[in-house]
Every structure is written in C-alpha cells, then in structure tokens.
C-alpha cells in the first residue's frame, strides 16, 4: 500500500494496527472489532438490571410441591390457571398417543383457547371461565379413564372421560400458564386416588356383601347401606353399644301406673327407640343395620271425613256412594225400587204466572206436569161446541191444571230416562191405535157411501128440529158443508197448537239434556190433547157418528114423514204431505225467542225412540 501511495503522489494516511480477532469470532479478521471500554461497562450494567430467569428444575426434582398439591386436592382448594383448548371425540379410552393426537388436532383447528381456572378435588374436575366465571366443564372423577401430560409440549395436559349421555370417549385438552403439564397430571391422579379411597372406606363401613350364584344370574345382598353418622366412627359405634346393652339387660314387665307417673304415649316415642329398647336385634341382621322408621298408628287412624258440605251426608245426596259402582246395589237404585210411590209431596216450584212465560219455571213446570200425568189415562176429546162460536174458529181445549212434581230422589236422572222410555212406548201404542182407527174410518166411510141412511161428521150435525107442530121446509144441511175444493177447517187449525206438527225426523248430534227436554215437551203436548194426534197422522175426516136423536126423521103432524136428508158430498181425501205444506204456508212467521228456556219455543225436531 505504501508503494502505491507513493507512486500516486497523494497524501499518506496513517496506518492503524488492529488487534487480532478472537479465535471463535465468525467472519474475516477485518470485521472483528472490540468495543471501547465505556460500551462494555454499560452492557454489564444493563444485564445487572434485567430479571434473571430461574434455573429450570424438572418436576421429578420437586417432590415437596407435589405433596402440597395432594393436601390441597383432599381439601378441595387445588387450582391451576390454564387455557382450555377444547374437547374432541377419540376412539380409545387410554393412551398417551391418543391425548397427543387430540392436542394436535385442536391446535390445528385454530380455535381460540379460553383463559380459565382448573379446580381439582376428590369429587371432580371443574373448569371455570376466568373472565365471566361461567362453568365450562364439570367432570366427575369416576368417569375419567386416563390422564397424561404431553411429551411434545411441556405445558400441555389432557384427560379422557366417558360422556354420560352419548356414551362416547371425549378428550379434554389444556395448556398450563404457570405450571407444567406433569404437575396438572399429578394433581388429577391424586384426586382419583382420594376418590377411590373414599369409595373403599364407604363400602367397608356399610358392610354390604353380595353373594352370586353359579350362573351369575342372581345374587343375595347382605347388610344395609344406611348409616347414622356419615364418616364419624364414634357415632357408628354408638348404636352397637346401645343394642348390646339392651340385649344384656333383663326385660322387666311394666307395673301398674302410679298416680304421679305419666307414661309416654306411643306417638311421642320414636320408632328407633322402640326397636332399641323393646325388641332385641335379630340374628340375621348385621350390626350396622338400622330399623326403618314407621309412622305411629295414631297418625294413621282416620280422624274423620271433611264436613264442609253437610248436605252431602244426607240420605238423598246424589254424591253418597257407600258401595262400588254396581248398578243393582247402589243406594239410589235400592231407594228407587222401594219408595218410588208418589205421596203427598210439596211442589218444588210455583205455577208460572202470566208474565213469566219465557222463564225457566215454565219449562220446569211443563216437565213436572208431564211426569205426574204420565201414568194417567188420556182424557176424551172435547165435545163439539154448538154455541155462538163460528165454524172456522178452532175449539180451544181447557188449560191443563198445575200438578205438583214428584219427590226428588238421588236417582233423578234415571227416573227421567224411565219416564222418557214410558212416553216413547205410549206414543208407539197411540200410533198403532191411530192406524187402526184410520183403517176403521176408511171402512166406515166406504160403508156410509153405500148405506141408505146418510151420516155426517159431528162437526157438521144439523141443529135439532123443534118438537112442536109446524110445517116448514126441510133443514138446509148443505149450507154448512165446505166447498169441495176448500180444505176442512180442522186441517190447518189444530186445537191447542199454533203450528202444524212437524214430521218426526231422527236427529243426530244433540246432547242428552236436549233429548230429554224434547221428549218431555212432546209428552206434555200429546197427553192432554189426544185430538191433535189425528191431525198428525193424516188429514182424514173424523169417523162418522150417527146423528143426534133430536135430528132424526120424525113424523109430520099430518102423519107424513120428513123427506130423507140429502147425503153430504164426500170430502176429498187430502194427502198428509200436501196438508202439512198448506199449513206451513198459512202459519204466520213468529220471531224465534232469544231465551232458550222460554216456554213458547218452536219445536223443530222430535226424537222417536
């Protein structure tokens, strides 16, 4: 360098001699330079101010910490700050490789771990969220099958358990924050050992053994699981001492009661004291068996039924059932068979007035009157009135007198059903009689058209001729006959009814109460007014009745007889269907009452049993 510099003629730069580089320094010797003395002093000062890491000591060299963890687990105060990675389903119930694969799978998912606290006790493992304090995992020790630290990660720890609902093997994985996975695994092992020890002690203390047979299909248990004092041996020995003393002491018969002595009642003495003091221990029972507590006999005796409803205990109460539900032996059935006769009873309701025709009393009165008149014979047809009443006006039957209802009994509903059946049978008999009468009427009409002596209906009877001697024209009978094309006056006008009877149509879908009410209404209308049955059966003229004696042919004063009366023109037979349609057209439209219990209801249907 000096020769080149001299040759070039430039200024010479002083040469700097560098110290040799250390042996282990990388790079060429020119780059290895030492720091000045001030820089080395500052570096030493900086290192002195830094926190030095503690020297790593393996878990096997720290047995004193493991002993502290074991005591904390038994007391239930052992906890570790961890990060909960999650859980996955595994195929095997044990194996370190199974746990390591589960940790790798959870870390590969990229799921964020939850900062939490792992509590380890002899009862189970609990994972609590450090931020929200939520319980993430609550695992019983009995379901844990395997736990181990991770050989690849120092702070990883996993355990395998059995899921209670799905019966699958689940692996839960953790990362310890301050401790190692070995310490967490050791703490879980201590918890499992404490749980097993507690279980063995419990089985030993209860003294329960099971003897299986040769086929292992049945077993016989000896002993009892009941213990008086949880885990205190002093209390477990107390019952044995008391039983031994009671067996050794001679039994003394109780003497007569002293005047000042009060003997305890059986209710105040506990069943346990009875068994300990009075009865010796059976030979087949074990010492740990404790007799069951039974209620004293005084508390089991019935003190009496509820007396809140005194009417229910009376004889006529429908809710009083001393026997089982056998229809022939029920008190109501027996009473109905014995005292069904209607005696002088007090009517349960007053007769309805003129103003309350649409009240409930009207319906009840109608039902009770139909009951009382069910067995009475039907009254005869009302006589034809020949007074000032016009021919077109219907004859009004006398109003039915009020009749008191029968005595109320517990089997009221059954009596109602019997009455309904009786009314139905009576209707069937009346229908048969009506059919027979109609046949007789037709025969009589045919005979009347051929007979020499004409007859006419009672409604068209001529007025009786005066008895005195007179000479006058014969009575004009034809003026009272209706025209041949006009319906008779009795076809549209029904006595006692403002409407023609509707055809009997079986109705389906009504309640039993409606059925009973309809049957009673029809019974009350049919029985006092049998004349309306003829109109229901058909619009045929009434049977021919011979004329009154006063209207028969009498000799004239001069000896010549009266001329024969001309035969009336036979009324055309009307079809029942046409008669009903004509009556429906002539009937005035009446507003339907809004009250369903009113007495003037329109009968829209009728049940025929």
Curated annotation (Swiss-Prot):
Residues 246-259, 434-446 have a biased composition (Low complexity). The modification Phosphoserine is found at residues 224, 228, 263, 411. One of its GO terms (biological process) is neuroblast division in subventricular zone. Plays a role in the process of neurogenesis. Required throughout embryonic neurogenesis to maintain neural progenitor cells, also called radial glial cells (RGCs), by allowing their daughter cells to choose progenitor over neuronal cell fate. Not required for the proliferation of neural progenitor cells before the onset of embryonic neurogenesis. Also required postnatally in the subventricular zone (SVZ) neurogenesis by regulating SVZ neuroblasts survival and ependymal wall integrity. Negative regulator of NF-kappa-B signaling pathway. Residues 74-223 form the PID domain. The modification Phosphothreonine is found at residue 279. This is Numb-like protein. Keywords: Cytoplasm, Developmental protein, Neurogenesis, Phosphoprotein, Ubl conjugation pathway. Residues 233-245, 409-418 have a biased composition (Basic and acidic residues). The lineage of its organism: Eukaryota, Metazoa, Chordata, Craniata, Vertebrata. The keyword Cytoplasm applies. Residues 19-29, 454-464, 558-573 have a biased composition (Pro residues). Interacts (via PTB domain) with MAP3K7IP2 (via C-terminal). Interacts (via C-terminal) with TRAF6 (via TRAF domains). Associates with EPS15 and NOTCH1. It is found in: Cytoplasm. SUPFAM superfamilies: PH domain-like. Pfam families: NumbF, PID. InterPro entries: Numb/numb-like, Numb_domain, PH-like_dom_sf, PTB/PI_dom.
